Amino acid sequence: MAIFRQLSLGAKAALAAGTVFVSMIVSRSYLAESLEFRAWRCLFRLQLALFVNSLMLLGSIYIWRSTVSNLRHSPAAESACFQLWKMVVAAFLALAHSSFFTMIFLVAEEPYLFSLVAYTCLGAYVIMLCFLCVLSGMEQAYQLLAWRAGRAVGSLDKTRKLALRPALAVMVTTVLSVVGLLNAAQPPAVTTVEVPVHRLPPSMNSLKIVLLSDIHLGPTVGRTKMDMFVRMVNTLEPDVTVIVGDLCDSEASVLRTAVAPLGQLRSRLGTYFVTGNHEYYTSDVSNWFALLMSLNVQPLHNENVRISATGAHREDDDWICLAGVDDIEANILHYTGHGMDLEKALEGCSPDHPTILLAHQPLAAKRALQARPDINLILSGHTHAGQIFPLNVAAYLLNPFFAGLYQVAETTFVYVSPGTAYYGIPMRLGSRAEITQLILQAAP
């Protein structure tokens, strides 16, 4: 205990994160079978929220020191304005930390105001933390260059420099947050992409597939947005509509009314769905499958359907194979009965007919092409095109395909949707939500 008290606050936060992470492993490995399923599911989601908050605490310490602690020796430190400023920063950080708990306790048909405010603060937290780190790095680089050149570092006194940093951070964070909020509030753009498909039957030339992904029904996305997406899709008059995962962030029973507009989708040859990683975080996939099927949305659980120009499941010569795999996160989580199984998903698909694969993560698309390079087209999501800066950089570096259309080989393409809505944070910076209209064109 004495050793723990001697640790810095940052070290304590890191230790807490490690402890919660170990408890998550124990919960997944040893408690999943002994606890009642609903109790275990709540426990695991609470552990996940605690783990994320433990990591966030490191950033919160840095923000607090940069915007409050470093100013305690300034002439204004005893003023009423500074005391008010401390309360504002504390409330801002508390709201940002509360955001992940709203995913457990505050999810309904429409978002609660508190959830929207909390996730907005989380977005501002990410922007501010990044800006402060970049600003600090620039200061250190300038000081190093000045020292190596044998020059004085600058004329500003230390107090003024310490006050300038939080002022700049607040201004930049406010401007970027407003821009991000306004951008995310816009309806998704409708993007039309023509994809050449080898061996596409003439009767299926110009087949229209509408792609949705990463809607993330939950604390900040509700029925109103879902209804808007459905109306936009219906105006496109799709032949096929596909939803490539991360539809939800809570249990089916909680979001039943929010997802109900999906039942109004009008797709001539059917609507299909594959799981994303967030479906497995809800630990409620079987109930989601049942709910979606009641809405005429067919889950492709490592399986495929044959689609012809006149209807699905036909045995004639003019058809394409539409296959879907479970998200690879199911393999990592050891989710019973689930996991990416490409061989099973493509069973019955013919090399003489085009194959289109639905796989939520671009990493799954890469693995699928390594195993089966004869797949014509893979449709993915997951990246959100980064959603907000600086997460764009991380999403680009961590995924083999980032956003848009990629030609992997002469007859093989991958399309990654930037997402139809957003995850949690109701902002988009450097990205735009999208509904994708893919037009299949016959290729030699």
UniProtKB/Swiss-Prot annotation:
It is found in: Membrane. A divalent metal cation 2 binds at residues 246, 277, 382. One of its GO terms (cellular component) is membrane. This is Transmembrane protein with metallophosphoesterase domain. Pfam families: Metallophos. A divalent metal cation 1 binds at residues 214, 216, 246, 384. Binds 2 divalent metal cations. GO terms for molecular function: hydrolase activity; metal ion binding. CDD domains: MPP_YkuE_C. Its EC number is 3.1.-.-. The keyword GTP-binding does not apply. Belongs to the metallophosphoesterase superfamily. LOC643853 family. The keyword Metal-binding applies. Signal peptide: none annotated. It is an enzyme of class 3 (hydrolase). The chain crosses the membrane at residues 7-27, 43-63, 87-107, 114-134, 162-182. Gene3D superfamilies: 3.60.21.10. Its cofactor is a divalent metal cation. It comes from the Eukaryota. It is a multi-pass membrane protein. Keywords: Hydrolase, Membrane, Metal-binding, Transmembrane, Transmembrane helix.
